[in-house]
Amino acid sequence: MAAKTYDAGVKDYRSIYWEPQYQVKDSDILAVFKVVPQPGVSREEAAAAVAAESSTATWTTVWTDLLTDLDYYKGRAYAIEDVPGSDEAFYAFIAYPMDLFEEGSVVNVFTSLVGNVFGFKAVRALRLEDVRFPLWFVMTCPGAPHGMKVERDLLDKYGRPLLGCTIKPKLGLAAKNYGRAVYECLRGGLDFTKDDENVNSQPFLRWRDRFLFCQEAIQKAEAETGERKGHYMNVTAGTMEEIYERAEFAKEIGTPIIMSDYLTVGWAAHTSLSRWCRKNGMLLHVHRAMHAVMDRNPNHGINFRVLAKILRLMGGDHLHSGTVVGKLEGDREATIGWINLLRDRFIKADRSRGIFFDQDWGPQPGLFPVASGGIHVWHMPALVSIFGNDSVLQFGGGTLGHPWGNAAGACANRVALEACVQARNEGRHLEKEGKEILTKAAQSSPELRMAMETWKEIKFEFDTVDKLDVQHR
């Protein structure tokens, strides 16, 4: 029996939108999709259909086509490549002209690129793997409110990763107990503590009470340690008016940094908050809650490298980027690629890290990648090696789970971090010599010694689901 061809709703896009001879322009927005076509649909037709449905086309010819220059405005599928290890999927490279999009609007770009086309019958699965944003578009977007250099100057902390902790349990603590947990962590040696992504303003922990107790903890810890401290106060809320109210209150009481869940709050709302942070001198920590809904399926959705680029355009000073070694999803080479996309000014295409296009960020400042999720002191050598200085290493259970309490857990992490940074600066190989480095440091730190004993058997053995395609290893 012949394979079914999906004719309904599909016109001959190949003759119009497939242009293998097209020479891409510096001003084009470029995208690469992983496409699994329906049976009976050729690669060229499927690629052209994606280009058409994500730009100018509808399912049939309409008379108003004659009132514009469709050849100027259309997206063009200009190349096709095999996906290593797959007999069904292929990469489709598509170029979009600059006038197809509103300047500075990530929302507008992705309404086209990942809009109706993802439900199109000609394709069985579709994944946006990478996007090249030309400099003209980058320069019209807000970017990071402040960036890494400004934050280091504000904190007066240089030469090492910043150290943080997510307060646990993530839900259920009353405001006074929550503030006490923050204080213990900060006085123990952490730079920051953090609200978890789903801490907003629940009945047991109203946002105003949380902010006040956390700010009291910050001020007390700063007075005792002589260091600048902070707590990422999550201002995410159900309306933009509530978000601004919470942000204004955080500014009023003197906190240096607030937090947003950029995917669940919405891209327009997050961009507005980012602009507010720049105007008001507030740092912005960004959580990626909901990302795995879009990026974990290797055949359908949006790769996290695209979501990371979106955030860099919209604005944030920190973004969670995976850990490689913790409990959450994160292929090593792919994660290093994401880290580079967040921090560096210019990134060369590098298929070994999953990066399909050169990306020039111009003068936009880089932001701190955040490692968080199931990490503890035994992971410190690998984290310092993978992430380098310009990063935030965030230990939740790996701080608060210390048998001697939060302050001891924070102290253990700080001692481990400084030992690893010193060893690295001496030229030692952290991932090969990590155990020896930590063991020596623990000789003068009972807190670290107890942390190492507590978590020596803890491992997360599950493999990564979303891996880089095998050919590029």
Curated annotation (Swiss-Prot):
Protein name, per record: Ribulose bisphosphate carboxylase large chain
Something else known: The basic functional RuBisCO is composed of a large chain homodimer in a 'head-to-tail' conformation. In form I RuBisCO this homodimer is arranged in a barrel-like tetramer with the small subunits forming a tetrameric 'cap' on each end of the 'barrel'.
Catalyzed reactions per annotation: 2 (2R)-3-phosphoglycerate + 2 H(+) = D-ribulose 1,5-bisphosphate + CO2 + H2O; D-ribulose 1,5-bisphosphate + O2 = 2-phosphoglycolate + (2R)-3-phosphoglycerate + 2 H(+)
Listed EC numbers: 4.1.1.39
Species of origin: Rhodobacter capsulatus (strain ATCC BAA-309 / NBRC 16581 / SB1003)
Signal peptide: none
Binding site for Mg(2+): 194, 196-197
Binding positions for substrate per the UniProt entry: 116, 166, 170, 288, 320, 372
Pfam families: RuBisCO_large, RuBisCO_large_N
Biological role: RuBisCO catalyzes two reactions: the carboxylation of D-ribulose 1,5-bisphosphate, the primary event in carbon dioxide fixation, as well as the oxidative fragmentation of the pentose substrate. Both reactions occur simultaneously and in competition at the same active site.
Site (Transition state stabilizer): 327
Family: Belongs to the RuBisCO large chain family. Type I subfamily.
Cofactor: Mg(2+)
GO annotation, biological process: reductive pentose-phosphate cycle
Keywords: Calvin cycle, Carbon dioxide fixation, Lyase, Magnesium, Metal-binding, Monooxygenase, Oxidoreductase, Photosynthesis
Record-annotated active site: 168 (proton acceptor), 287 (proton acceptor)
GO molecular function, one term: magnesium ion binding
UniProt cofactor note: Binds 1 Mg(2+) ion per subunit.
N6-carboxylysine: residues carrying this PTM: 194
Subunit structure: Heterohexadecamer of 8 large chains and 8 small chains.
Keyword Oxidoreductase: yes
Gene3D superfamilies: Ribulose bisphosphate carboxylase, large subunit, C-terminal domain (3.20.20.110), RuBisCO large subunit, N-terminal domain (3.30.70.150)
